[in-house]
């Protein structure tokens, strides 16, 4: 399962996650970064790099941020 960037990223966009991603699947989505779900290899390198704890494995996204799964897919052009 891919990782998902959620609400805490909005307005922060620290780029630490971008720098550690080995497959460069994290992109600028305007107000936040997003992870392309078809490019993510599920390595998890981005999770500890995020200073605002905005990144989760898709299956572990907190209930209040479940909409970010679809938002990441839309930003990636998959919906």
Curated annotation (Swiss-Prot):
Gene3D superfamilies, sorted: 3.30.70.20
Residues engaged in binding [3Fe-4S] cluster: 9, 17, 50
Binding positions for [4Fe-4S] cluster per the UniProt entry: 21, 40, 43, 46
Record-linked Pfam families: Fer4
GO MF assignments: 3 iron, 4 sulfur cluster binding; 4 iron, 4 sulfur cluster binding; electron transfer activity; metal ion binding
PROSITE patterns: 4FE4S_FER_1, 4FE4S_FER_2
UniProt entry keywords in alphabetical sequence: 3Fe-4S, 4Fe-4S, Electron transport, Iron, Iron-sulfur, Metal-binding, Repeat, Transport
Co-factor remark: Binds 1 [4Fe-4S] cluster. Binds 1 [3Fe-4S] cluster.
Cofactor(s) listed: [4Fe-4S] cluster; [3Fe-4S] cluster
All copies of domain 4Fe-4S ferredoxin-type, residue ranges: 2-30, 31-60
Function: Ferredoxins are iron-sulfur proteins that transfer electrons in a wide variety of metabolic reactions.
Name the UniProt record assigns to this protein: Ferredoxin
Organism name: Thermus thermophilus (strain ATCC 27634 / DSM 579 / HB8)
């Amino acid at each position: 399962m891919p990782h998902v960037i959620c609400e805490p990223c909005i307005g922060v966009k620290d780029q630490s996650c971008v720098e550690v991603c080995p497959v460069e699947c994290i992109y600028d989505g305007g107000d936040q970064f997003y992870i392309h779900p078809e490019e993510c290899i599920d390595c998890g390198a981005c999770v500890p790099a995020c200073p605002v704890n905005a990144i989760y494995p898709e299956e572990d996204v907190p209930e209040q941020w479940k909409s970010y799964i679809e938002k990441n897919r839309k930003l990636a052009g998959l919906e």
